[in-house]
Amino acid sequence: MSNRPNNNPGGSLRRSQRNTAGAQPQDDSIGGRSCSSSSVVIVPQPEDPDRANTSEKQKTGQVPKKDNSRGVKRSASPDYNRTNSPSSAKKPKALQHTESPSETSKPHSKSKKRHLDQEPQLKSAPSPSTSKAHTRKSGAAAGSRSQKRKRTESSCIKSASVSEATGAEERSAKPTKLASKSAASAKAGCSTITDSSSAASTSSSSSAVASASSAVPPGARVKQGKDQNKARRSRSASSPSPRRSSREKEQSKTGGSSKFDWAARFSPKVSLPKTKLSLPGSSKSETSKPGPSGLQAKLASLRKSTKKRSESPPAELPSLRRSTRQKTTGSCASASRRGSGLGKRGAAEARRQEKMADPEGNQETVNSSAARTDETPQGAAGAVGMTTSGESESDDSEMGRLQALLEARGLPPHLFGPLGPRMSQLFHRTIGSGASSKAQQLLQGLQASDESQQLQAVIEMCQLLVMGNEETLGGFPVKSVVPALITLLQMEHNFDIMNHACRALTYMMEALPRSSAVVVDAIPVFLEKLQVIQCIDVAEQALTALEMLSRRHSKAILQAGGLADCLLYLEFFSINAQRNALAIAANCCQSITPDEFHFVADSLPLLTQRLTHQDKKSVESTCLCFARLVDNFQHEENLLQQVASKDLLTNVQQLLVVTPPILSSGMFIMVVRMFSLMCSNCPTLAVQLMKQNIAETLHFLLCGASNGSCQEQIDLVPRSPQELYELTSLICELMPCLPKEGIFAVDTMLKKGNAQNTDGAIWQWRDDRGLWHPYNRIDSRIIEQINEDTGTARAIQRKPNPLANTNTSGYSELKKDDARAQLMKEDPELAKSFIKTLFGVLYEVYSSSAGPAVRHKCLRAILRIIYFADAELLKDVLKNHAVSSHIASMLSSQDLKIVVGALQMAEILMQKLPDIFSVYFRREGVMHQVKHLAESESLLTSPPKACTNGSGSLGSTPSVNSGTATAATNASADLGSPSLQHSRDDSLDLSPQGRLSDVLKRKRLPKRGSRRPKYSPPRDDDKVDNQAKSPTTTQSPKSSFLASLNPKTWGRLSAQSNSNNIEPARTAGVSGLARAASKDTISNNREKIKGWIKEQAHKFVERYFSSENMDGSNPALNVLQRLCAATEQLNLQVDGGAECLVEIRSIVSESDVSSFEIQHSGFVKQLLLYLTSKSEKDAVSREIRLKRFLHVFFSSPLPGEEPIERVEPVGNAPLLALVHKMNNCLSQMEQFPVKVHDFPSGNGTGGSFSLNRGSQALKFFNTHQLKCQLQRHPDCANVKQWKGGPVKIDPLALVQAIERYLVVRGYGRVREDDEDSDDDGSDEEIDESLAAQFLNSGNVRHRLQFYIGEHLLPYNMTVYQAVRQFSIQAEDERESTDDESNPLGRAGIWTKTHTIWYKPVREDEESNKDCVGGKRGRAQTAPTKTSPRNAKKHDELWNDGVCPSVSNPLEVYLIPTAPENITFEDPSLDVILLLRVLHAVSRYWYYLYDNAMCKEIIPTSEFINSKLTAKANRQLQDPLVIMTGNIPTWLTELGKTCPFFFPFDTRQMLFYVTAFDRDRAMQRLLDTNPEINQSDSQDSRVAPRLDRKKRTVNREELLKQAESVMQDLGSSRAMLEIQYENEVGTGLGPTLEFYALVSQELQRADLGLWRGEEVTLSNPKGSQEGTKYIQNLQGLFALPFGRTAKPAHIAKVKMKFRFLGKLMAKAIMDFRLVDLPLGLPFYKWMLRQETSLTSHDLFDIDPVVARSVYHLEDIVRQKKRLEQDKSQTKESLQYALETLTMNGCSVEDLGLDFTLPGFPNIELKKGGKDIPVTIHNLEEYLRLVIFWALNEGVSRQFDSFRDGFESVFPLSHLQYFYPEELDQLLCGSKADTWDAKTLMECCRPDHGYTHDSRAVKFLFEILSSFDNEQQRLFLQFVTGSPRLPVGGFRSLNPPLTIVRKTFESTENPDDFLPSVMTCVNYLKLPDYSSLEIMREKLLMAAREGQQSFHLS
């Protein structure tokens, strides 16, 4: 889990803190995020942040590096010798080389420039020369072309002190081509607001360094508290640097003589003279080649160049920038990435230029990459403004001294800012030249003639390189050193020299990635070492070097025959070397062409065999290898057959079904996609797979193990939408292709995409790398502006449009003799079993999927099956499926593709099985829909409200006629074979550069993409030549903007289902002139399809249903008439008795009435009224109608005939049938939209690179900001007016972030009238006390409220959502779009400035503000017993014994209209309301009878609607929806009003998404779907940033300390983490144990909280010995208080209950479990259902009393019967009453009085002790007993409990759950036995164990035999909590991992106990010799190992 800390105290640093100085938790703030780091960061800065970023990068000539190579780490490491940081100077040396593991090991985005992306390259020991704040590359060495292209942007000096170019740069007056779109707005001064709670704002590695430089106008400085100062320390020393550790071996091998002298290495830097100036403007350390003549010369040259800069506005400049590098805390990182798109383009540009400047990586360019890590200097700190007032004084004095010096030399003061970075660079020059001069010396050593000298030199060279990075090795002579090392590498007789030379080359590529272009020359020599192995070490080292080279130069290796050489002696190598060899093979296959196949051919058998290997990494590389081959050869059928010849298909098939799975989710997707490609392009392979029984494999993958091929009930195993998509694609491709003519002719139109540009030519423009891109609207605008601003001209070209005349059919469909079709004819049995096995599964996938892509694919596969199956088989297959009703609902869809598919399916079925379907199509409404289509004028027009894309199209398919359908749907082609999925890349790209696999190789190209507007996101691949943009998208800037957001790496986005044609969406190149035409094309094409639908529908009716004289000859057709007649009888005005209900029952349960018939008979509305209406005019009262209904459907007694004995539920079958029919209706009618960003990711080279759905969009949010103008509301003049100009706001920041920003700057203070009418221009000071208050407290009183227009914004809404929903522009845009078509809003959202008004909160409004996510007041609670209006009742109760009557929960549900909290509209609303009533009746029916058993008639699980559940799950899996808080209203409203539609886990996720802040929602999502975060690229990660607060507690005083912890942190939004005094453990395990132990302490008998009996623990530890605990088998419930209880005692108990409320709420909020067995009535109180508690609830707290009450109630009922009996005389009645007895005793003889049973001191009414119970007051007595036990006696405790709970979050959020489910939410899963199979699936053996290991099998056998108590002990031992989360071991996160505990050879494992790491659920298990020993040791460890966390 992304941020679970482990036992390593330094290991808890988190992503957001990439460049914090490794701060250890300080003052309870974990992860280096100090408590005082403001979580909103808004810094007014004089310039647009994006531009700052851009210019910074332009000047650098380079780009933020985002990969694992060392450059990042170097520059991100702390400044060890900054003079202004006393702490760093004193750091012991050992610490200088450490780095927190969580820092180093973050996977970063991969860049094409540096392709070092595997774990070994994560190593990095901070180098001293990072010590300067990094300045920009420049100076004399800046002569490279990349520098010349820069332009001094004097008119917009960045952040007032972005350092400018050197004189050399200025003299090259050539202006840059990049100008900021937003420069104008920037001049007004923009600020940046980010929100630390924004989950998407994880700071990527590059962003971290960005925060190193920040410009903050003096007034805007955020003062930091002492916590942040404390955090200014070097990186955490808690764990050694991975780079060091991984190379210690090498260094130790070099022998004593070459021992590296750390002190000497660093001494020149560490012992700098005191006068060293640390310039404030500097922000990036740099070592270049030595400058001309030191400082003086430099100053002189700068003075000369001042003239050129002086036009910059002087006023802004003096605001000096401080480097906040060491102090940056987590929250600032959220802004640090925020260089918006332009910044990105600038960066991309720079990286491109440096590449062009010197591809060979010569000396000059090498150092130009020195500071690759610079990313958004302003974005981070400028935006964040985390500069500290707490910096050491020396800094200021030195700056002052420097300024004085410069002014004395005649330098104008305002140039001081720009000068800063240069100075720092100069210092570096003098120092840094050391490295390159050292290299020159060593070079001479390498070239010496003496071997010992050469060995010494090469060893030292290794050390220089292993410790160096691009900064420290500036000017390294790569071109000279490489040939020298290659020469040494050829000294066959000297293994030492060869080994070290090989190492040196490896380290060089790691330290200086661009050197790889030179190292390429060594490839032949490396390969020689592999062809003849003389020294295994040298060979393995050569493999490591080749692996690094292969990432960028795989072609060179391939063509040198390297692939075969690497695999030649594969088995001889160590496992790591084998992995390297296979990785090289995979990289070599990346862009292989058919001509190069011979290089691979001989190695294929070896690779195929490798698929059977156990090593996961090897297998994944091998899969990648084959996937790339198949992708690259997809059109070469003969090559595909060769690739697949040797057992490949069999081995891969086995690999897919191995349990537990070896393949990760991404790799699985890639392998299945590989199969699809093979089948679609080479049908003979499809036939081969069919013969290998692929159907069973697919069935297993979709449904798990099964018995028999055609089951009635199909349960799908949970799979991600992407996996489903690929599996259904494969099924589709295994069937022959559909024909091209007849009813399928329309497919070509669908395929072409509705947006085909049929012009013969398209226009393209050329970017700076010489790549051509099609024009689109946004690009066009931006390019024009840039060209104008910079005076640049661009080349454009006209090129034939490949789509104008392509044959639209896909390749696989061109095959005339499809082998698959042949097989269907020749081997009908095989075809039959295939179809039988998979049809039902496909059908189920279609029904249960919500994303459009999967559904389109399924529909296509089903069509193929139906078309090719014969009639008999079809009849057999279809008999179990309601095909007709599905076709009916598909026909009502808003998605054209679905409608077309439904018509085609109906046509085929009518041709093949006319007799059957002519009846069913009538009954199920297919006819009705087809006629509707045939007659409809405005075909398929969708209502103006949000797209109601019915069951067919959900998600990103918008209503088809909205005109803005995304490329994702309307432009997507046919749903058939993916034959061209990848080929389109080849067929259309101009150069190999555009090939898919290439793009993946150049992973981070987007950053260098064409110049793109700042609101157009970075593209994720460079094939922009025909970027996936269809003219659909060119209709509006927004859509084309979305298209640019959806590059094809999002998979077949534009072709999600689109397969058989050249990608339609590639017609992006629509020139401005063609735009209008393209609009016509779209509507034209859509009109054509609509025309086809109408015509086809007409023909269909004509052909099959013209003779409407079907005179009821088929009895099935009479059902509708019967139902209509019965419905008319349900009339409320006349009493029709129960006959009509009986008729309805028989129709529902005996005939198979269809959903269509139920809808069209009016039955739903009528039954709803019948059950709910309560009007005067009703002939029969509602109660009687309800009892009649229950009598008919459930055999309860008729009204007036209730028996004396209890009424028990008898048969529920008819009611169950009715519920199922209603659910079917709901599924068919509902049209709830799903906002899914359903971009099946991936590309032929798949797997590890497939970007997860939505992650691109998240990256977009992370890099773009909204520009907002804050304005004081015109209605108020008593707060300050904002004068700071527009601010830039993180789109995912919450509205309350803006409030925090303004309030801490004093804008929340309401002025008195006599104060100044407006603000003086004084600098805004930040009120520290307010800032601290905001940071530390969860419950800050809101002071300001915000409006957009008239709309008041909720505090917990994201700013993006607010702008999107309420801004005026949004109103205009909404006409043409909706959420589904574009998650990111139109481009306008990102370019316009939005006005947000603020005004103070009025006192009266303050009390009832909305409160969510930490900023909440107490939610409104129901009036409790103590409120004044109940005072009179109290007296009645006490004096007269009158208690309130029990409320009937059924009343609330019995309403014929939608309750007020349902605001959505949907065709299925009546069905939903009826189901809601039926559920309430089933659940609460017993309230209608006074003697009924309290049992549900139908279990709630029977009401679950699978279709709604699928939609909800799909919605809740979408990270983008959760990040933006954009959950559709229907989902939240249904979740609360009709929770029964969804299973518990869906509602639990919905609860976490709506109840808490976004970060928790994201965390929950990641816990349940870990694959979301598997994406490799750091910036597409969606890691939440949850604050953590650590507290240390003492076990001896646990309860007391827990109370104070909850008092302090209960309402804080930070996650609470616990550590115990004198124990080393910290993190998840101790925290879980804390909740479990506190739960136990609260059950202590001496606290007097609970009813129950006292017991002692069976296995007490420590303070538990001798302590009594309360046990109640039914569940705990509060002990009642009487009226006379002591106030002090009451107060004490109330305090404990208040604490319990806080504890439980905090546990829910932090995803923790408590271990409290609470009773059901307790949970009813939590949900405010206490007024409906009855005598039945007594059974849940005290069964003994409950049974007595039960008998006495029978006596009361008999008494009532006697009294109602008219035949009784007074005497006989008296006599009869006296004979009423209980167990033979009369009531009087029982000796009861009016006190509470079991509590003689609690009187039920005044003087109750003295009032005996008689037969006459028995009823009053029973009522009082129940009321006191369940209500009156415990109300004060529960009021306190609810108060405590609501101080954390409102109880109203728990409405998603039923009382009986709260136990699961709070305490986890119910105890049940563990079976070995489940354990095997859920637990992970590792580090020495596999599933086949003896010890693992023993363990599973032992665990499955544990009883409940042993299970609890084991769980507490291993995880810290005695309960598992809901879902058992499956839901345990991280999963239980069993690792082997190793011993010395002399030790016997049987003598040792197992140990655990609770934070990661690791069980370290010795390999015991027998099962008995293991059981004994496990139980002993579990008993003895409780309650202590020490190092094992």
Swiss-Prot record:
- The answer, when asked if Phosphoprotein is one of the entry's keywords, is yes
Low complexity bias (residue ranges): 29-43, 175-188, 196-215, 330-339, 961-973, 1029-1040
Stretches that traverse the bilayer: none
The signal peptide here is: none
Reaction equations catalysed: S-ubiquitinyl-[E2 ubiquitin-conjugating enzyme]-L-cysteine + [acceptor protein]-L-lysine = [E2 ubiquitin-conjugating enzyme]-L-cysteine + N(6)-ubiquitinyl-[acceptor protein]-L-lysine
Which keywords label this protein? Acetylation, DNA damage, DNA repair, Nucleus, Phosphoprotein, Transferase, Ubl conjugation pathway
Question: Which residues does this entry mark as bearing N6-acetyllysine?
Answer: K181, K1425
Q: Where is this region: Disordered?
A: 1-398, 938-1044, 1407-1434, 1568-1587
Where does the record place the modification Phosphothreonine?
T1377
> Which residues are in the HECT domain?
1885-1992
Q: In which pathway does it act?
A: Protein modification; protein ubiquitination
Answer whether the UniProt record assigns the keyword Ion transport to this protein.
Answer: no
Gene Ontology annotations of biological process type:
DNA damage response; DNA repair; DNA repair-dependent chromatin remodeling; heterochromatin boundary formation; proteasome-mediated ubiquitin-dependent protein catabolic process; protein polyubiquitination; regulation of embryonic development; ubiquitin-dependent protein catabolic process
GO terms (molecular function) for this protein are:
ubiquitin protein ligase activity
Q: What does this protein do?
A: E3 ubiquitin-protein ligase involved in ubiquitin fusion degradation (UFD) pathway and regulation of DNA repair. Part of the ubiquitin fusion degradation (UFD) pathway, a process that mediates ubiquitination of protein at their N-terminus, regardless of the presence of lysine residues in target proteins.
* Entries under PANTHER family matching the protein: E3 UBIQUITIN-PROTEIN LIGASE TRIP12 (PTHR45670:SF13)
The protein's name in its UniProt record: E3 ubiquitin-protein ligase TRIP12
Give the organism the record lists.
Bos taurus
